[in-house]
């Protein structure tokens, strides 16, 4: 029995070889069956053991062959992928090399550096920004332009004037005068560009004459000192002016004085009230808006047209004192929402603030304006109200 067991086990040893193609080591010993412990013998099972192991070995070998074939077929595709990536890298390197080849040569870079150096030196030598330098440059260009013009007695005279003006400008002391002359020169330059016409020459000559007069009026240094002292004294005097409240008080006193003077010279008819050069009549009876307009016209006046905030405050006070609703000369009869005075003038936007809250609301065809409480209200024009007429004062001497 021992010899037969050795003969059965011997073929299994052949399966211990290492398959090089797969790289996996298989040990079939691990698959040998262990004899089970029990009361019965396992001789029947061992009789079929070699056949099962052979079938299992063939199955594993077939799996290894399939794996090897898959790797063989996959190899060329991965190689082609690596090749394509190398091609892309090569193309990028080629493009980069071409771009580097297009860069400026060293001599070009040197040339650019020299240009920059020269430019830096030139910028460093630029003169400081001054109005006199600009004027001098303008005069130089202007002189060149005039020098190229056809010979003419008037042009020659202009050239001489410019020469003298150039000398005078070089000694200009005042910045304000420099600015004035610079502006004149700017206009003169524009005119010289259009010189061919005789009328333009005449215009330039007149400009030069005025410019020469302006230069001639520049004060000497001694005069400048005197003017400076005068300005200093004036500044001190301005500093001593009364404060704003004092100024307001003085203004009010002057206003009162003017009003008193007007009353002495100008009078209003009986039962009329004077205010700021006008006479106002406040009715004691009531009429509708249209009849109120007619009543004012009959006495040579107008249903009141308000021209200022002061006048509005004065009239509003007169109306509120008597607690009356009073017509004014304002309506939107011609076009709804467009308010207009009886003299044809439109209602100023600054006067919109005088409407009472929520007014005008056109509630029931309300097209005429009235003084109501502390502001204005729109009401139906056929309602009877008091009214105010306005006309200018008549100034005369007592008989």
Swiss-Prot record:
SUPFAM superfamilies: C-type lectin-like. Residues 71-399 are extracellular. Pfam families: Lectin_C. Sequence repeats lie at residues 108-130, 131-153, 154-176, 177-199, 200-222, 223-245, 246-268. Residues 274-390 form the C-type lectin domain. InterPro entries: C-type_lectin-like (IPR001304), C-type_lectin-like/link_sf (IPR016186), C-type_lectin/snaclec_domain (IPR050111), C-type_lectin_CS (IPR018378), CD209-like_CTLD (IPR033989), CTDL_fold (IPR016187). The chain crosses the membrane at residues 50-70. Its main location: membrane. Keywords: Adaptive immunity, Calcium, Disulfide bond, Endocytosis, Glycoprotein, Immunity, Innate immunity, Lectin, Mannose-binding, Membrane, Metal-binding, Receptor, Repeat, Signal-anchor, Transmembrane, Transmembrane helix. Glycans are attached at residues 92, 361. It is found in: Membrane. Ca(2+) binds at residues 359, 361, 363, 366, 377-378. It comes from the Eukaryota. Disulfide bonds join 265-395, 268-279, 296-389, 368-381. PANTHER family: MANNOSE, PHOSPHOLIPASE, LECTIN RECEPTOR RELATED. Probable pathogen-recognition receptor involved in peripheral immune surveillance in liver. May mediate the endocytosis of pathogens which are subsequently degraded in lysosomal compartments. Probably recognizes in a calcium-dependent manner high mannose N-linked oligosaccharides in a variety of pathogen antigens. Is a receptor for ICAM3, probably by binding to mannose-like carbohydrates. Homotetramer. The tandem repeat domain, also called neck domain, mediates oligomerization. This is C-type lectin domain family 4 member M. The lineage of its organism: Eukaryota, Metazoa, Chordata, Craniata, Vertebrata.
